[in-house]
């Protein structure tokens, strides 16, 4: 019979957990909860790591953790420190007994692991200091704390472009830690504030809500605020801790929460430790790439399947101010739905850099649906890496990111449709088999073949591995998109539009004929002959250029659409101008048949249940007319358009 437990700061853990005699901690309620039970948490701040002991048995028989209606409930991984002594100037020192941290001291734990690149010469730590909720910056030395310098930008290791800090003056608030046998001393520059009169908190716990055991299925978490987790680096070759995480389970619902200030990742749908734990970084015997290949098979042996792992729902959450990811996952994110989340300020402190940082970073998101999210002011909006097969990215809003998207070493089918990509740097396409349909793409793009890393593809709608392949580039589709250029200015190796595909074949028949009659031996011809691409009814403005063999397209190089994203108190608005004749450019909606078959994965673009797919909704979710406008909106008008988009 369903039981309802209550938790309140005024409660006692020795009480029965009723509304009249509530528990004092969420962890105490979690010890009692069985399938079907509900834990109602009342207003207050709970400084604990909640580790659910048991989950539900099926989607309708869950263990539910929820904030009481209309009440603010905060779970923090930090503790208050109020014993500061003045060192000199605006620098103060606090001495903390190590027993406060238990077995995990964030001021010893470094942010490192596979694919961690910077900083070099020293290590950033999982600890953090907060003044009235605002996070500081770790300093390399105590002298740097005493003499801080403003950090204005970092140079991105990928292509050398500059990424600027949003609030450079905040970088003057710095801290440094010294750890001894019994104590940890934290030095911090409070820039004139008295830390004994203000709220000062420091990271203590690794997570806020994360089960110790795997297989804790069908948990619901809703209505909470969580903050200040000392999460470690979360590459796909290690256990991926998050401030909240599913830990290799099935069927969680994480909804209507606020997550912020996780040192690395906020929400984890990731892998667990037995399938590999930073082996390349630790032992240097094999590359991270090789260990990640092994992790796929280890995951399959450890239950990775639609029946046992994934199928999570992460919706309507606000996620911000995290160092690595808003949402992260490898394998455990498969078959999931990521809907309606607002993700921003991810990776923008630039304290560390590695090849795993994005608002959403997934490996193997098989049949995962990413719809209706708003992602902005991130170093990278989304990154679909390895085995993004059956994945759909639809009706999302991305803007003011250093880069909107990256798709890497995956072979399709991947559908990207009805999105607004408004940042200056649009995409890195290091993949094949992607369909871009009805998007507005305002930034530059890069296309790269990957011929030194062969990655898996799967049987349709399954985790079962069907084979491996390099990324030859191509086998992509572009239908009904609006591309906006940079007025014809040079963009290095980047391109605006689809002219980066010039030289590709344009049909399966042409590709097969050239590969079959080439001069090379077997696989050599498939490296030299470019895979086909399919393009139709795209619009190219302001210097964006079309693929040389796209015959049905609209180009107006001199027309500037003057795209503007405006954030207002009542929402987000998009303003843009369209040229004359745009209302006459109509095309039929795209479906499974039109998208055709894929070369490497040897499958089609269909729905997760295997049924034919119709891309028949626009950005707003409205049903498109049988013939509708290019871009993410069913209706366009000549001249100025102004739309509320969030």
Q: Where do the model's predicted regions map?
A:
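The right-handed parallel beta-helix/beta-solenoid scaffold, focusing on the short coil/turn
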Residues: 3, 37, 48, 61-63, ...
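Extracellular polysaccharide-degrading/modifying enzymes targeting complex plant/algal/animal polysaccharides
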Residues: 4-248, 260, 268, 274-304, ...
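All-beta strand scaffolds that present successive hydrophobic residues in beta-strands
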Residues: 41, 64-67, 219-221, 253-255, ...
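Short glycine/acidic-rich loop motifs that flank beta-strands on beta-rich extracellular proteins
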Residues: 49-51, 206-208, 230-236, 241-242, ...
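Hydrophobic, small-residue-rich alpha-helical packing segments that form membrane-like cores
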Residues: 262-265, 269-325, 330-359, 363-365
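C-terminal structured domain segments across diverse proteins
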Residues: 343, 358-360, 365-377, 382, ...
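Catalytic-core region of carbohydrate-active enzymes that cleave or remodel glycosidic bonds
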Residues: 399-403, 412-446, 456-487, 496-542
């Amino acid at each position: 019979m369903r039981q309802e437990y209550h938790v309140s700061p005024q409660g006692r853990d020795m009480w029965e957990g009723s509304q009249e005699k509530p528990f004092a901690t969420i962890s105490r309620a979690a010890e009692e909860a069985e399938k079907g039970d509900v834990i109602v948490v009342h207003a207050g701040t709970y400084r604990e790591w909640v580790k659910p002991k048991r989950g539900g048995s099926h989607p309708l028989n869950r263990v539910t953790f929820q904030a009481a209606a209309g009440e603010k409930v905060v779970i923090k991984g930090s503790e208050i420190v109020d014993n500061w002594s003045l060192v000199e100037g605006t620098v103060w020192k606090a001495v903390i007994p190590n027993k406060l941290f238990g077995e995990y001291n964030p001021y010893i734990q470094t942010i490192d692991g596979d694919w961690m690149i910077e900083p070099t010469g020293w290590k950033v730590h999982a600890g953090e200091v907060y003044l009235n909720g605002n996070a500081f910056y770790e300093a390399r030395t105590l002298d740097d704390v005493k003499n801080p310098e403003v950090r204005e930008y970092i140079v991105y290791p990928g292509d050398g472009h500059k990424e600027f800090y949003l609030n450079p003056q905040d970088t003057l608030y710095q801290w440094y830690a010294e750890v001894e046998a019994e104590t940890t001393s934290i030095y911090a520059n409070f820039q004139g504030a008295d830390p004994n009169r203000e709220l000062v908190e420091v990271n203590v716990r690794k997570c806020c809500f994360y089960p110790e055991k795997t297989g804790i299925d069908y948990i619901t978490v809703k209505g909470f605020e969580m903050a200040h987790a000392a999460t470690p680096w979360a590459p796909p070759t290690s256990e991926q801790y998050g401030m909240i995480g599913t830990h290799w389970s099935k069927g969680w619902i994480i909804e209507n929460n606020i997550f912020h200030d996780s040192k690395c990742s906020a929400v984890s749908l990731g892998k667990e430790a037995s399938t590999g734990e930073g082996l390349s970084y630790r032992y240097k015997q094999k590359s991270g790439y090789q260990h990640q290949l092994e992790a796929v098979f280890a995951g399959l042996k450890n239950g990775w399947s639609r029946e046992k792992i994934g199928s999570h729902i992460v919706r309507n959450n606000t996620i911000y101010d995290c160092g690595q990811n808003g949402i992260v996952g490898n394998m455990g994110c498969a078959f999931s739905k990521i809907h309606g989340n607002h993700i921003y300020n991810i990776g923008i402190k630039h304290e560390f850099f590695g090849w795993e940082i994005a608002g959403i970073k997934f490996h193997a998101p098989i049949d995962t649906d990413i719809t209706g999210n708003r992602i902005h002011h991130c170093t990278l909006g989304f990154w679909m890496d390895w085995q993004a097969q059956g994945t759909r990215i639809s009706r999302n809003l991305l803007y003011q990111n250093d880069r909107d998207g990256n798709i890497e070493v995956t072979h399709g089918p991947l559908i990207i449709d009805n999105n607004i990509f408004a940042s200056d740097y649009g995409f890195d396409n290091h993949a094949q088999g992607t369909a871009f349909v009805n998007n507005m793409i305002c930034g530059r793009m890069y296309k790269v073949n990957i011929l030194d890393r062969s990655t898996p593809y799967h049987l349709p709608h399954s985790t079962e591995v069907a084979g491996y392949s390099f990324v030859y580039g191509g086998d992509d589709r572009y239908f009904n998109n609006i591309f906006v250029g940079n007025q014809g200015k040079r963009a290095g190796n980047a391109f605006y539009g689809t002219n980066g595909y010039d030289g590709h074949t344009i049909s399966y028949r042409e590709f097969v004929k050239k590969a079959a009659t080439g001069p090379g031996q077997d696989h050599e011809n498939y490296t030299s002959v470019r895979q086909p691409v399919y393009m139709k009814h795209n619009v190219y403005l302001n210097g964006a250029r079309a693929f040389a063999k796209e015959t049905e397209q609209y180009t107006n190089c001199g027309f500037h659409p003057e795209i503007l994203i405006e954030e207002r108190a009542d929402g987000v608005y998009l303003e843009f101008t369209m040229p004359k004749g745009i209302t006459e450019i109509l095309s039929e909606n795209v479906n499974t048949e039109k998208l055709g078959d894929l070369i490497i994965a040897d499958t089609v673009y269909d729905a997760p249940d295997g049924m034919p797919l119709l891309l028949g909704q626009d950005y707003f979710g409205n049903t498109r007319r049988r013939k509708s406008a290019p871009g993410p909106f069913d209706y366009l008008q000549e001249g100025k358009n102004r739309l509320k988009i969030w």
